[in-house]
Curated annotation (Swiss-Prot):
It comes from Xenopus tropicalis (Western clawed frog). GO terms for biological process: purine ribonucleoside salvage. The keyword Metal-binding applies. Mg(2+) binds at E140, D141, D200. This is Phosphoribosyltransferase domain-containing protein 1. PANTHER family: HYPOXANTHINE-GUANINE PHOSPHORIBOSYLTRANSFERASE, PHOSPHORIBOSYLTRANSFERASE DOMAIN-CONTAINING PROTEIN 1. InterPro entries: HGPRT, Hxn_phspho_trans, PRibTrfase_dom, PRTase-like.
Length: 224
């Protein structure tokens, strides 16, 4: 990734252009059983880690000195959430501003194969009532059309939290987007189906360290 091809922006995160082709698979360490199912390494693990640390800095700057309930969206968000929370804790230990955190979990189901379903399923939504009056940081893996997050925020608003911020590792540029933007974005990416770093395709590829683009062979192989 060169300086000319990647545009840093606080609002949009790191913007990866449509013509970015990623890295060849053979220059990274990948599980052999996945190599034929992937098109490229799109975002290397080290870049993800560095970007996550910067997001943690931004969160400390904006909402330090608060007690935060971190709402991790499972399953895809768990790795980003784990790393983000760890970075925030490390920053908090060495800062005059202290963030105390508790982590809770919710599951959203909106995909079958690589197609977004019309109806959002919120699993664990009955527990949202305990977020009333709390400062909430929602941690998500990817914003696709924005409809999923908009629906979750609408549901959460019924319980009147004190504050809600959203951090998403990825935001996808899509013609079907409702233009929702999270408060903190890791990377803005083209309209490609990506896997790895806990993002899955029918529960496969979560164990990849890098974010990769799945190819058509992989989609057909693991289709349900």
């Amino acid at each position: 990734m060169t300086e000319k091809s990647i545009c840093p922006s606080r609002d949009n995160g790191v913007v990866i252009p449509d013509n970015w082709t990623g890295y060849d698979l053979d220059v990274f360490s990948l599980p052999n059983h996945y190599c034929e199912d992937l098109e490229c390494v799109f975002i290397p693990h080290g870049v993800i880690v560095d970007r996550t640390e910067r997001i943690a800095n931004d969160i400390m700057r904006d909402i330090g000195d608060n007690h935060i309930t971190v709402l991790c969206v499972l399953k895809g968000g768990y790795r980003f959430c784990t790393d983000l929370v760890e970075h925030i804790k490390n920053l908090s230990r060495n800062s005059e501003r202290f963030i105390s955190m508790r982590v809770d979990f919710i599951r959203l189901k909106c995909y079958c194969n690589d197609q977004c379903m019309d109806e959002l399923q919120i699993l664990g939504g009955e527990d949202l009532a305990k977020l009333s009056g709390k400062n909430v940081l929602i941690v998500e893996d990817i914003i696709n059309t924005g409809r999923t997050m908009t629906a979750l925020l609408s549901q959460l608003e019924k319980y009147k939290p004190k504050m809600v911020k959203v951090a998403s590792l990825l935001v996808k540029r899509s013609a079907s987007s409702n233009q929702y933007r999270p408060d903190y974005t890791g990377f803005e990416i083209p309209n490609k189906f990506v896997v790895g770093y806990a993002l899955d395709y029918n529960e496969y590829f979560r164990d990849l360290h890098h974010i990769c683009v799945i190819n058509e062979k992989g989609k057909n192989k693991y289709k349900v």
